[in-house]
């Protein structure tokens, strides 16, 4: 992670500080403006490593031990990635309509900030309050999701939401087909 940050222009000190807080999903920065202080390339690197930090560590162990399907076959990971992508896409379209003309910036800001919030990392690259009440509400609610169980992320975790959804579906089937 630190080497990737250096490759896109961070100093060694900034790269190490931000690598530690990205991989641990700790999210603190040595700058008041957090990732708003850096160029867009740094945000893309952070997106990749925040996603990696939000995945279950046991899947990485399985991957290293030769199970190449460990990550792609996990429903929790699929749910996390799809949720992140869907919410970031929604935020992108809203941002692109609010601030037309710079679609790359809208895409980067939506991916970075949504990944940061859903993973619990807490970095920011923009002032969310300028995005309007609807997107602030979206950010609040995705913060309640969190990453995958078995990762360093905070919040409820995707796995627990999957368990609740399964239990609800099971009960609904029992109500509909009692015998």
Walk through the language-model features, giving the residues of each.
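Membrane-proximal intracellular helices of multi-pass ion channels
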Residues: 1-179
